[in-house]
């Protein structure tokens, strides 16, 4: 087992400078070199040649270093997890609304928009009003009006027949 700093574990078989610079955010080659020099070690030393007291010195120096993120190393994974959770919430909302999760909606997803905006518009209300008034204005309205008229006539005839049957009994 190598040096453990917060949640990060450094590899024993590689040089400490390379591991520090690769694994810890905010540590470059020069900072890693200075940390190792402050701990009193040679720059090219590997992790398996360190004593526990030297490991503790390196960890203490890194935790006191002001240029780095706080002593809780490994926050990158937690931050990414938060971002993923927020993305999932957004996706859930989009799916519930019926919109696409990714991509444009200004020019794309027109079928969804059409389905959502289904309502009785002004044209259909006008047609209903004309039918009620009895004056169709165009060919389609006349067809509908004539069909309705025929249906009403059939109903009236059926009602008259049923009334005649009742009076005979």
From Swiss-Prot:
**Gene3D superfamilies from the xrefs?**
30s ribosomal protein s13, domain 2
Name the PROSITE patterns for this protein: RIBOSOMAL_S13_2 (PS50159)
Q: Which molecular-function annotations from GO does this UniProt entry contain?
A: rRNA binding
Classify the source by domain of life.
Answer: Eukaryota
Classification via InterPro entries: Rbsml_uS13_C, Ribosomal_uS13-like_H2TH
> Would you identify the family this protein belongs to, as annotated?
Belongs to the universal ribosomal protein uS13 family.
The entry's protein name is Small ribosomal subunit protein uS13m
Q: Which organism is it from?
A: Dictyostelium discoideum (Social amoeba)
Tell me the organism's taxonomic lineage: Eukaryota, Amoebozoa, Evosea, Eumycetozoa, Dictyostelia
Protein encoded by which gene: mrps13
């Amino acid at each position: 087992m190598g040096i453990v700093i917060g949640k990060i574990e450094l590899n024993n078989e590689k040089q400490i400078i390379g591991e520090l610079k690769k694994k810890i955010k905010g540590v470059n080659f020069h900072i890693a070199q200075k940390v190792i020099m402050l701990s009193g070690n040679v720059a090219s030393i590997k992790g398996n040649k360190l004593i526990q007291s030297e490991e503790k010195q390196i960890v203490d120096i890194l935790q006191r270093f002001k240029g780095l993120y706080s002593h809780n190393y490994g926050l990158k994974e937690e931050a990414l997890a938060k971002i993923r959770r927020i993305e999932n919430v957004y996706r859930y909302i989009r799916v519930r609304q019926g919109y696409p999760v990714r991509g444009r909606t200004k020019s794309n997803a027109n079928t969804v928009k059409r389905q959502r905006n289904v309502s009785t518009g002004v044209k259909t209300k006008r047609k209903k009003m004309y039918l009620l008034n009895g004056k169709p204005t165009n060919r389609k309205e006349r067809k509908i009006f004539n069909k309705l008229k025929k249906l009403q006539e059939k109903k009236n005839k059926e009602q008259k027949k049923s009334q005649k049957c009742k009076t005979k009994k």
